[in-house]
C-alpha cells in the first residue's frame, strides 16, 4: 500500500521495459522489502557482508557482491531507500531538515527550508515532487551506464536526454556550441578562433598519446594551456573548462581537465545529439533503488528502519537497535551517515558542498532543447555580482522529468565555495536565473524578433545571447512564485571533482586492526559521502575499490552470466535505439500565503 509520504515506486508505476528481441514482453520489476513487500520479520543469523546505508555506492556494491555469490545483509536506519542519494517528497524533506538541525543526520548542517502553502494544503501535494539530495547527470559514455546495461538495472529505469549547457558571462546566458557544424556556422566566432577550437577538439580526443603537447603544461593550469598552446580566448576557455569539463575553478590541472573535456565530447552522439542523460522520477535515489532491487534478486536481504548499534571485531557480531544480532564473516561497510553512536573511526569530512534547491511555479521551457526537460547552467568565477571565486552550477529539471507537476520546475544550485560567501554566490546565481526567467516571460517578448524565433515546427526558441544582452537595462514588472526553497551544507571527504581512490579505503583498512576502547565502530570500513561532482563518475570507482577490499580482486565485478547472454551481447546495436526511445533577487519573490519555514530560512 502506498504511504502518504511516499511516491509511487518503479514497480508500482506503469510497466516500462527495454527489450533486445523483436517481440518484447513487459518487464516485471522485482519487488523490494519496505516498499511493495513487507520487511523481513527476522534478521539472518550469519552473513558474509553487512552494508549500512542504501546510497549509490553502497547499492552498487551490494548488487555486485550479491551477484558474485556473497550473502549480503543491506540495512538502512531510514524508512526509505537512498540515504545520502535519496529522492524525497516535500514532507520527507521537512522531516529530514528537522533531523539535520537536531544533529541526528551527520555530514549535513545549516538546513533551512521554506514551503509555500500551495504545497500540502493547496493545489499541489507533497508527493507531486521528488527532490534529490545529491542530483547527478549520467554521461552517455561512462562506467556506470555500462554497468546499468550489463546488470539490466537499466530495464527498471527511464531516461531523458540532456543537450543544453549554458554559460553565464557578462550578464549573458550563452548556449554551448556542441558540434563541428555549430562551430563553423556560429557567426559570433572569428575564423581563427574556429580553427583553433577545432584544432583543440581534434587533440583532446586522443590527448594522452600526444605527450609532447600537454606534458610541458602538466603542472600548470588548463587556462594557461588553452591560451598559450591553442590561442583560445576567455569565452572559449571558460566554456571548455566550466561548461564542458564541469570543473569548479581555473586552477584545475591540465591532465584532469583534458580527461573531463574528453568525457563530454566522446559522450556526444553515442545515443543521439546529446552528451548526457537524466533518469526520470529521480536521480541517484532512483538508480540506487534499482541496484537494490537487482541485489535482492541476487539474494541480498533488505531491512529498513534498522540501525546499527555496534560491531565487535573479535566476535564479528553486529548488534542492531531492536536487539537483533548477526555474525559477519567478512566485512562491515558503513555510510558515514549511518555510523553508530560512539563511533571513533568516521573519516574527517573536510570539504563543503553548499546546495540550494528551488521549485518555481513556471515551466521555464526556454532553458530546454526541443523535446527535452533538462538543462545545465554554469556560472564561472567572477561572473556574478557577488564576485564568486568558485563556479556555481545549476541543474534544471522540468515536468518531463516526472519530479514535478506541469507548470513547475526544479532548480538545483551548488558550489564548493567554503564558508559564508558560498550562500552569497548561490543567491547571486539564483537572482540571475530569476531575471532571465522574468525577462523571457514578460509581456511583449513574443514581438521581439531578435530574441524570439520560431522553428520549422512552430516551436519557440530563445536567442540566449540577445536575451542576456538586455539584462543590465531590464527591470522586471512581475515577481517570481517560489513554491519551495531548501538550503543546506553537505560535508564530504572527497575534494571537488576529485577521484575516489584506494588510498582512502587503505586508511579504513588500517582502522580495522586498530581497536579503540569504547568505540562502537571498531573493525568497520566507511564509504564516502557524495562529492560535489555533478556526474556519477565517482560511484563505480568507489564501489569497485570497496569490492576489491572485500573479495580480494575486482576481476569479477559485475561479471554476470544471465541465461540469455546472447541478448546482452546484442546490446551494442540495440541500446542506442532503446535509449533514444526512453529518453522519450529576494524582492522579486512572491510567496503566496504565509508558507511554512523549517530552520531559519530568510526569503
From Swiss-Prot:
Picking any one GO molecular function of the record gives:
GTPase activator activity
List GO BP terms, alphabetically.
endoplasmic reticulum to Golgi vesicle-mediated transport; protein targeting to membrane; small GTPase-mediated signal transduction; vesicle-mediated transport
Where in the sequence is Phosphoserine found? 470
Q: Which Gene3D superfamilies match?
A: FAD/NAD(P)-binding domain (3.50.50.60), Guanine Nucleotide Dissociation Inhibitor, domain 1 (1.10.405.10), Guanine Nucleotide Dissociation Inhibitor, domain 2 (3.30.519.10)
Q: Which Pfam families match?
A: GDI
Identify the InterPro entries for this entry: FAD/NAD-bd_sf (IPR036188), GDP_dissociation_inhibitor (IPR018203), Mrs6 (IPR017230)
Q: Which GO terms describe its cellular component?
A: cytoplasm; cytosol; membrane; nucleus; Rab-protein geranylgeranyltransferase complex
What are the protein's UniProt keywords? GTPase activation, Phosphoprotein
The family classification in the record reads: Belongs to the Rab GDI family.
Q: What does this protein do?
A: Substrate-binding subunit (component A) of the Rab geranylgeranyltransferase (GGTase) complex. Binds unprenylated Rab proteins and presents the substrate peptide to the catalytic component B. The component A is thought to be regenerated by transferring its prenylated Rab back to the donor membrane.
What further note is attached to this protein's record?
Present with 23800 molecules/cell in log phase SD medium.
Designated name of the protein = Rab proteins geranylgeranyltransferase component A
